[in-house]
C-alpha cells in the first residue's frame, strides 16, 4: 500500500504542473514556488477522509486547449496600452477623445515619424489615425488655469480670443514653412512659379478653344447630340478633338474611319503555319502510292497504243516495256528505302495541271483501291486490272486531247513537263520518260527507230537532271518565300495588341491612342522635372501628369506617364519598378484603357422643362469660367461688362443669342379666359409624359460640348477633370442622356431634380473671392518693407565699438549704415528673395480654399444645444465626448449612466433633452388633512 500511496501523492502534486509549465512566462515569482514546496514535501500528515478525486471517473485526455495551456487572458495587454498610448477610460485626457497624436503645442508635426500617429486601438478606424491634425488647443478652463486669479471675465474672454487667433496664425505659418519648398505648393502660390503655371494652362485652354471653334465652323459640333443612343458619333468627335490637340492633320483623321483589327482571329494562326512546314510520314506514304499508281497506269497504256498504231513492229520491240517495267520496279523499291531514311518529299506542282485532270485521277485512284507495288508486276494478267485499264485508257485519251488543245499555240515542252511532274516524286525514272517521248513522237510524226536503248536512257537522264535542278531551285525559292511570310506573320503576332503609329510617308497616325503608366507613390519632394528626366530615357515618351497631394496620403502624390501606343509598355513599367527616386518606391503599374467612355445618366434630363433649366445653368457656368480665365476678354475690352448678360457682351459663339432660349412663352391669358389653367393644374398633379424639344436640345448640346472640350467639365456628371491636358486620355469620358422613362413624371419630381442638380453645380458658379486686408492682417499678413528691415538687422552684427560685421560676406565695417549699403549693393538678390517670400506667404493667406491641416477634434466642440447628450447639458460621464465616440459597443457612451438634472434654458428650444426620464414628484401629506394635490400640478 505504501507504493500506491506514494504514487497517489505524486499524481496529486503533479495536478497543475502541466498548466504551470506552460504559463511560467507570465511572471511566476520565486515566493510562489517556495510556498508550494512546503506543502508538497509534507508527506506525514494524515488523511482521515477520502479525497474528492476518488469519487470521480478516470480522467480522459483533454487534447490541446489554448485557454488552459496558455497564460490567462487577464494577463494579456494590447500594444497600445503602454505609457505612450491614451487611456481608454477616464475624463483626464487633455486632447479630447482621440489620442496618440503626440503633438506639441508649438510644433506642427508629431514627435514621431513623419505622418505616423501614435498607438491606436485595433478596432478604431485606421483613417482616423492616419490623418494629420493640428495640435489640440487649450480649452477656456485650461487657459484660465494659466492666468492670474484676479482676472475679470471680460479680460479672460478677450485674452482667450487673442490666444485662439495667435494659435491659428502659428498653424498657418508652420504649414507654410513645412511645404513652401515643395513643387505643388510653389505652383499654387509662388509669385514666379504660379505665373508660369497660369500661362501654361491658359495656352492649353486657348488651344482647346481654337479646336472647338474650328469644329463648330465645319458643322461637326451641330451634327452630334449628347445621347447614349449616339455613342459612335460622340466618340468620333472627342477623338477628333484629341487628334487636333496633338497636332494632327485631316489626313490623320482617316484613322477614325478604319475598322479596328480583330485580334482574336489572327493569334491562333501561328501554330497552323508551323504545322504546314513539316510533312508527316503519312503524307510521304500517300505520295509514294500515288506515284506508283500513275506508273502502273502509264505502263498499262503503253502496249495498247503500240498495238493500235504500229501492228507491224517485231516481237522484240514489243517486249521492251516489260523489261523496263522490271527495272522501274527495282528503282522504286530502292528509292522507297532512301525515302524512309531521308524523308524529304517534294511537293508536286498542281498549278500547271488542269482541275479536271486532278478530279479524274482522284476518281481513278478511288476506283483502283489501295494497290501495292507487288501487284504492279502482274497487273496485266488480272481481269479486274483489264477493266480498270479500259476505263483509264478512255480518260487518258480525253486528257491528251485537252492538253494538245491547250499546248497548241505554245511549244510541246509544257505538255511533257505536265506529264513528268507526277513522276518527279520518285527519282531516276529514265526508262519511263523515254517511253513517253516515243509515244509523243509517234502521235506527231513517224519516229525513227533507235539503234540502241542506251542512248535513249542517257538522253532521258540528262533531261531529267536538268529538270530536277530547275525544280529544286524552284522549291528552294518557295521555301524561302514561305519562311519570309512566316517571319512576317510572327512579327505581326508579337505586337498584335498594339495599334502601330505608322509615320512612314503620308499614312494616318493614331494620335488619340496612347499607352500609360500609373505611379502610385510620389513623395512631396519629387519634382515633375525629375520624373520627366527618368522617363525620357525610354522611346515614345510624351508627357507626365502629377496630381495634387492628398492629406489622407500624407501629402504623397500620384502620377501618370504617357507614351506612344507602339511601345512595349510592360517592359518600361518593369524597369520603372526597379528604380527608386529620392529613396521612394514609385509603385508603377500599367494604366488600362478606358472601359466605358460614354456613360448614361437619368433619361429625365431630356424633358423640355429640365432642358431649359440646364441651358440657363450651362450658360452661367460657361460665362463664369470664361470670365475667370479671361478667355474672350480681348474682344470684350471695348464694351461695358455685364455679369448677368450672357450673349450680349460675350464674343463666345456658343453664348450668342442664348437669351432667345432662356425665356419661356405661354398663353397664360388665353388659358385663364378659357378655364384651362385648372385643367393644367390637375394634369401636373397627375403627371405628364416626358416631352422632348429638339431645338432646345441642340442648343444645350453645344453648351455641354463647349464645357467638355474647352473647360474639361462633364456637365451631367457635375465634375471637372483637372490637368486633363497632361493626362494620358484627353477628352476620355463624357456622360450623356440615357433613354427617357416611359412612365409619367410629376412636376414635384421635376422641380426636385432641378434643385438638386443646381446644388451640385453650385461650385462652378461661385466666383473666386480673396480675403480682405483686415482679415489677412489678423491672420498674420506680412509687410515687404518690414521684412526687409528685419533681414538687414539680422545681418548687421556689432562686434565692438565702431566695428560691425556682415555675415553674408564676412566683411567688417565701421557703422551699421555701411552694412546696409553693402547689403543693398552686393546682396540685392537676397533682398529680392525676401520680398518674394513675403508675397509668397501673402498669396497663401489670400486663398480662401488654402490647404491646411484639419483642426483637432477637441478644438471643434459643438454647443450643448447642437450635440445634446443624454445628460442634458452636463459633460458626458467617463470623459467620453458625445460627438466623437467610436461606433462600436465596448467603448461607446454608457447608456445606463445617471442623468443629471436639467437646467432652465438648456436643451433644444426649451424642450426636454432626448432620453431624459423625469422623476415623478412624491408628496408627503397627512391623511387627515384635505387634499392639496393641486399645488403640485
Curated annotation (Swiss-Prot):
Biased composition (Basic and acidic residues): 8-22, 29-63, 76-87, 293-316, 323-336, 343-356, 413-452, 459-473, 480-500
Gene Ontology CC: nuclear body; nucleoplasm
Name used for this protein in its record: Serrate RNA effector molecule homolog
Gene this protein is translated from: Ars2
Biased composition (Low complexity): 367-381
GO biological process, alphabetically ordered: primary miRNA processing
Protein keywords: Nucleus, RNA-mediated gene silencing
Function recorded in the entry: Acts as a mediator between the cap-binding complex (CBC) and RNA-mediated gene silencing (RNAi). Involved in innate immunity via the short interfering RNAs (siRNAs) processing machinery by restricting the viral RNA production. Also involved microRNA (miRNA)-mediated silencing by contributing to the stability and delivery of primary miRNA transcripts to the primary miRNA processing complex.
GO molecular function: nucleic acid binding
Keyword presence, Nucleus: yes
Alphabetized SUPFAM superfamilies for the sequence: RNA-binding domain, RBD (SSF54928)
